[in-house]
Amino acid sequence: MRASFSPEPERISLEVGSGGLLMRRLIDRHILPAFSNPYLRGLPDASHLPGGIAFTTDGFVVDPLFFPGGDIGTLAVNGTVNDLVVSGARPEFLSLALILEEGLATADLAKILSSIRKAAAKARVRVVTGDTKVVRRGQADKLYIVTAGVGRVIGRPAAAKIRPGDKLILTGPLGEHSLAVMLARGDFGLAAGVKSDCAPLNFLLPLWPQGARWMRDITRGGLATILSELAERLPFSVRIDEDKIPVSRPVRGAAELLGIDPLYLACEGRAVIVAPIKKAGRMLAAVRHHPQGRKAEIIGEVTKTAGRPGELLLATLAGGLRLLEPLTSEILPRIC
């Protein structure tokens, strides 16, 4: 049974930013009715427009600005690029809007702009337009970034083509970005040596012409929320195997200490792919061939023999099946 909600709140709460059920309710009840059109159907990470163009937009409010493995600049580039990649598009161009708080150190801004330049070069995209605004001290938190991305369509995600037996490929270990950002805040006095996985996913582009059915980058809400949302769209269930899901030892240890389930932690350089059963082995090998994908695993499958249609099930280490729900409240605010 899916979670129910309390009456509509009068104010937006921080929990809405989780990327889970509360965010989905806000979108369904307020945003989609205001702008409903065919391009928004299914809430894609990027919309496919006439002329073979894909278009996406994103906002970044991460706190702190700098964290092990990256900063708000690398995050802005890679987050936008990855939304295009998993939508079946080769990234080409970005826009960049900066909202600066009065008092921001110009040295920090210079460092972030350098990160943006390097990340864009690595992802083979160009920043071609932008805007800059400055607000009074206290009216923003140092720096916010808003991007848009344009790419060339080379494949089309199609949840409607997913069939029982299709395999789920996870491209790498979970949770590294969320925990790197959280530990960088210093709130818990932990030093787990965790680095963000923030990186572009361009190496997955060849999987589209090879027959990948569907992809998503694992951002807010984590793997469990993303696959729950996929399962809800299918006339089948989705099963993932706990013993196949890669989680690094530092992430697992820190998550256990903090009482956090890694299945709900965000990444910024990982994706989950639905592959046809006959092509899954070749696709897994292709992912593992790239340094970012060397720890990729087949973690489960689409099935009609376990659970009910629309459910996401975890085959646990103890041998049982556990129903996984989408995230309902914020675990770690402002991680992207």
What is each of the regions a protein language model found here?
Residues 275-281:
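Helix N-cap motif at beta-to-alpha junctions
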Residues 282-292:
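Short amphipathic alpha-helices in soluble, non-transmembrane regions
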Residues 1-30, 321-332:
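N-terminal amphipathic/basic leader segments beginning at the initiator methionine
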Residues 43-44, 265-270:
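Short Gly/Ser/Thr- and Asp/Glu-enriched loop/turn motifs at secondary-structure junctions
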Residues 290-336:
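Acidic, Ser/Thr/Pro-rich beta/coil linker or hinge segments at domain junctions
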Residues 13, 18-170, 176:
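Glycine-rich phosphate/pyrophosphate-binding loop regions near the starts of catalytic domains
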Residues 101-103, 194-267:
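Active-site-proximal betaalpha loop/short-helix elements
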Residues 152-201, 313-314, 334:
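Phosphate/diphosphate-binding glycine-rich loops and adjacent basic-rich segments that engage nucleotide
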